[in-house]
Curated annotation (Swiss-Prot):
Protein's recorded name: Ribosomal RNA small subunit methyltransferase G
GO cellular component labels: cytosol
Family indicated by similarity: Belongs to the methyltransferase superfamily. RNA methyltransferase RsmG family.
Chain's gene name: rsmG
Organism of derivation: Cereibacter sphaeroides (strain ATCC 17025 / ATH 2.4.3)
Enzyme Commission number(s) from the entry: 2.1.1.170
Length: 208
């Protein structure tokens, strides 16, 4: 780990065991990345800052306590695997459901979950194919515009649940577009890794 990586790791405020699991995860991503493109090749050297810290920041915005966390379009496990790793220490009674339609990436997710001994279920399917999950928290990183995310998440959200959606600099236009189809009042939280990015926290939404 570089000096910057160590600073990120320290800021996560987790045990040495959890940090060790996150290091294992980072190694797995690098190992598999050449074959199935889990993250951009140019970001491999910044995996702690660009990916692990960026994913881990969602933990502080979660519902507490929570039972089920549903991660849509999990890809290489960002944020799902990172958050499930933190949960082994912070919320061991919780479970994570990761949805990824790409069979190769779903295989990676299962491998990572098994290697790290995580309470994770992986569905190699499209979100629309799943029965309602009644999730307490739903996340999705770099999956779709907010309008589409609302449509994907709504059938799976528990009555008192929440959604956490990281968004880039154009988040305001995404909110405006989504409000044409959805009644919602998202909380806007600044990203700790990118000054132009935010996390949108939605506690309730209803189709117009």
């Amino acid at each position: 780990m570089t000096e910057d990586d160590c600073k990120v790791a320290e800021a996560l405020n987790v045990s040495r065991e959890t940090l060790g699991k996150l290091e294992q995860y980072a190694d797995l991503v690098r190992k598999w990345n050449s074959a199935i493109n889990l993250i951009g090749r140019s970001t491999e050297g910044q995996i702690w800052i660009r990916h692990i810290q960026d994913s881990a920041q969602l933990w502080g915005l979660r519902a507490a306590p929570f039972g089920t966390w549903l991660d849509l379009g999990s890809g290489g496990g960002l944020p799902g695997i990172v958050l499930a790793t933190i949960a082994t220490e912070k919320a061991p009674e919780s479970r994570f459901v990761l949805v990824e339609s790409d069979q190769r990436k779903a295989t990676f997710l299962r491998t990572a979950a098994r290697t790290l001994c995580l309470n994770v279920t992986v569905h190699a399917a499209r979100v629309e194919q799943l029965p309602p999950q009644r999730a307490d928290v739903i996340s999705a990183r770099a999956l779709a515009p907010l309008t589409d995310l609302c449509a994907l998440a709504a059938p799976h959200l528990a009555p008192e649940g929440m959604c956490l959606f990281p968004k880039g600099a154009n988040y305001a236009s995404e909110i405006a577009a989504a409000r044409l189809s959805w009644n919602m009042e998202p909380e806007i939280h600044p990203s700790v890794t990118d000054p132009s990015a935010v996390i949108l926290k939605l506690k309730a939404m209803a189709h117009v």
